[in-house]
Curated annotation (Swiss-Prot):
Protein source organism: Arabidopsis thaliana
Gene of this entry: HSP17.4A
PANTHER family in the cross-refs: HEAT-SHOCK PROTEIN 20 FAMILY MEMBER (PTHR11527)
Name recorded for this polypeptide: 17.4 kDa class I heat shock protein
Compartments in which it is found: Cytoplasm
Matching InterPro entries: A-crystallin/Hsp20_dom, CS_dom, HSP20-like_chaperone, Small_HSP
Amino acid sequence: MSLVPSFFGGRRTNVFDPFSLDVWDPFEGFLTPGLTNAPAKDVAAFTNAKVDWRETPEAHVFKADVPGLKKEEVKVEVEDGNILQISGERSSENEEKSDTWHRVERSSGKFMRRFRLPENAKVEEVKASMENGVLSVTVPKVQESKPEVKSVDISG
């Protein structure tokens, strides 16, 4: 059995195997009529990593969930001076022909997320780190210069 979801064969269910019985999904194939027989959840694979973007007084902080990936499999780039791009790829496993697969749910494939950074971003000082499947990207902000206020003595 292939590790790649079946796009033309529909579900992989064996009625004699209690571990392969799927629960009926009334929305299965709802978004992809006519394209394939594959459920929408199978073709989505690993297309998008979930990303949080928060702004602090000092920086823009991005956190991306990339479970199971090593830092060598993820790229963080700044394009065109203000586009933060986070991308990566999860490779598929080698399948053993002698194994009997009961369920294939983990996906493989590429993902890419792009964010337009605001003008106050210091793109030359971007830092990234990864821990426990969470990528953290910190983009420092340009410190706004506060207008200097000078008191003027009033004569008279």
